[in-house]
Design a protein with these regions (language model features):
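Active-site loop segments of alpha/beta catalytic cores
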Residues: 1-35, 98-349
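Compositionally biased, low-complexity repeat tracts
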Residues: 2, 18, 30, 56-57, ...
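Short aromatic-enriched loop/helix-cap "lid" or pocket-rim segments at secondary-structure transitions
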Residues: 41-44, 59, 74-76, 82-83, ...
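Short acidic, Pro/Gly- and aromatic-enriched capping/linker segments at domain boundaries
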Residues: 45-63
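A contiguous, low-structure linker/loop signature
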Residues: 59-106, 126-133
Length: 349
């Protein structure tokens, strides 16, 4: 890292992209999905999702493109999930009758892309200052669970794998059609993919099942990044370190939120700064107590950075989640981010 110190200051975008490429950079980037209301400084990353796919998110809930109803929860600041008990597919063999891709006729893709870029700029993150990542959906496993619920969805994967493949192939074809229409108007700096295939304890499915039923579709989608020579990131919560090799095999460069239930030191030892850990911190244990001190919060940040950022290959990704306006949550997050922006800015000097 030392050779870059003293040179012209890198933008958040430049610093983040250099991190993803395994290159020298000036400070620990903070990975985000995009600017939050009230922010004035550019963020490292803005995640652009085609409006046709995420209009329900922009509206705070409602039907996704497939007809799944998403609802928010107060306790998670309105974060959305499929409405419990209201699933649209109860028999995987009948998916052809239920799952219908929406029409893409008459869409002005260039205007759609520009609206998203303009929104980022209006929030203080123009694309010359903030990287633009391109994402489309929550993941192939997660889409299946959204259609069927976990009980029926997992049974379908075990009992009717060929039907699952056919369904996921169908939705993959749709997503790739959307991507091929809009991605060159977006000109993304990064390709983002997602799939929460794990709990804190372990993946929902075996590695073999993941490689047979889920990975092929991620591989097809990852071609969008490989063909353009841009970094590829994977969002996957939970204990999924046994899947890192699979992700790397299709070109993934980074993993968020890389939770602490994983053997992150083992991942770091194997890949060094060529596979970026974006996380390595969780709001668990003592940090959740009401009397947690400011110093304990700051120490948790320093420990994560000391563990994983020492040779690069690390981005901060973490914070407390609670109801909008929760004062204790805001207090803790303000302390955390202050430490990220002080310790993380001096770590490589």
């Amino acid at each position: 890292m030392a050779e870059i110190i003293g040179k012209a200051h890198l933008t958040e975008k430049e610093n983040y992209l250099r991190t993803l490429r395994g290159q020298d950079h000036e400070f620990v980037p903070t990975y985000t999905f995009g600017p939050m209301p009230g922010m004035t400084e550019p963020v490292a990353n803005c995640m652009l999702e085609p409006e046709i796919l995420v209009e329900f998110r922009m509206n705070g809930g409602g039907l996704d493109p497939w007809g799944v109803n998403y609802v928010g929860t107060t306790e998670t600041a309105g974060a959305l999930l499929p409405e419990p008990g209201n699933f649209i597919l109860d028999d995987i063999t009948k998916w052809h009758d239920v799952i219908k891709a929406p029409s893409l006729e008459g869409i002005d893709w260039e205007a759609m892309a520009q609206r998203s870029l303009d929104r980022f700029a209006a929030m203080g993150s123009p694309r010359d200052q903030s990287a633009v990542s391109f994402n489309m959906h929550v993941g192939y496993f997660q889409n299946l669970m959204a259609f069927m619920g976990f009980e029926e969805g997992l049974c379908a994967m075990s009992e009717e794998p060929e039907e699952v493949k056919a369904l996921l192939s169908y939705i993959c074809d749709f997503y790739m059609e959307v991507a091929n229409h809009i991605i060159d108007y977006v000109q993304p700096d990064v390709l983002t993919m997602m799939d929460d295939v794990a709990t804190w304890r372990a993946p929902f499915i075996s590695k073999d099942m993941f490689e047979e039923l889920i990975l092929p579709w991620h591989n097809i989608q990852a071609s969008l990044g490989r063909e353009r020579g841009i970094p590829i990131t994977m969002h996957c919560c939970g204990h999924a370190d046994n899947l890192v090799d699979d992700w790397v095999s299709i070109g993934v460069n980074a993993w968020d939120p890389a939770q602490t239930c994983n053997d992150l030191k083992g991942v770091k030892a194997k890949y060094g700064n060529k596979f970026v850990i974006m996380g390595g911190w969780d709001s668990v244990g003592r940090l959740l107590e009401k009397d947690v001190t400011e110093e304990e919060l700051r120490l948790s940040v320093r420990e994560s950075m000391d563990n994983y950022a020492y040779d690069g290959g690390y981005c901060w990704c973490g914070g407390f989640l609670g109801p909008i306006g929760d004062e204790e949550c805001m207090r803790k997050n303000n302390i955390i981010m202050d430490e990220v922006n002080t310790y993380g800015r001096t770590l490589y000097k």
